[in-house]
C-alpha cells in the first residue's frame, strides 16, 4: 500500500504538461485511448443547483506581456518546468498554467504572474 500511496503522491505533483506527456506515453505503451466516453445526460440533470460556489480554479495565462523573461521565470518557479517548456508555454498563450487549484492559491499565482507583467485569467 505504501507504494501505491507514493505513486498517487507523485502523480498529484505532476504539472499539466507532464501529465499530458504521461498520458501519451501510457496510451502508446498499452495501446489504449484516454478519450472519455460520451455520456447521455439524465433528464433531471438540468435542474442542478446553479448557486454552487466554485472551489477549483484554472489559472490561464492570457498574454505574456512585454516582460516575457520575468514571466518565464515565474512560470518556471510555479510549475517546475524547464526553460524551453516555460518559454513555449508563455509564447503560446493563452495556455493554462495550473489547473484545479483552490481559490486562495489561484489568487496568489495570479498576483505573482501579474507582478511579473503577465495577463492572467481565472476560470
From Swiss-Prot:
It comes from the Bacteria. GO terms for cellular component: cytosolic large ribosomal subunit. The keyword Repeat does not apply. GO terms for molecular function: mRNA binding; structural constituent of ribosome. Keywords: Ribonucleoprotein, Ribosomal protein. One of its GO terms (biological process) is translation. Coiled coil: none annotated. The keyword Cell inner membrane does not apply. It holds the Pfam family Ribosomal_L12. InterPro entries: Ribosomal_bL12, Ribosomal_bL12_C, Ribosomal_bL12_C/ClpS-like, Ribosomal_bL12_oligo, Ribosomal_bL12_oligo_N_sf. Belongs to the bacterial ribosomal protein bL12 family. Forms part of the ribosomal stalk which helps the ribosome interact with GTP-bound translation factors. Is thus essential for accurate translation. Homodimer. Part of the ribosomal stalk of the 50S ribosomal subunit. Forms a multimeric L10(L12)X complex, where L10 forms an elongated spine to which 2 to 4 L12 dimers bind in a sequential fashion. Binds GTP-bound translation factors. This is Large ribosomal subunit protein bL12.
